[in-house]
Structures are given as structure tokens and as C-alpha cells.
């Protein structure tokens, strides 16, 4: 769902930072 996609993006951002 949209929430899962948001969580996935958030995780990627954290990994990049």
C-alpha cells in the first residue's frame, strides 16, 4: 500500500543519510 511505499522510501533515505 501507500504506507508501505512511504516506509520503504523512508528506509532508503535513512540508509543514504
From Swiss-Prot:
Keywords associated with the record: Amidation, Amphibian defense peptide, Secreted
Record organism: Uperoleia inundata
InterPro entries associated with the record: Antimicrobial_8
Tissues and organs where the protein is expressed, per its UniProt entry: Expressed by the skin dorsal glands.
Protein known as: Uperin-3.3
Keyword RNA-binding assigned: no
One GO location term (cellular component): extracellular region
Subcellular location per the Swiss-Prot or TrEMBL entry: Secreted
Top-rank taxon: Eukaryota
Single biological process term from Gene Ontology: defense response
Modified positions (Valine amide) in chain numbering: 17
Amino acid at each position: 500500500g501507500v504506507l508501505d511505499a512511504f516506509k520503504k522510501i523512508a528506509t532508503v533515505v535513512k540508509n543514504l543519510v
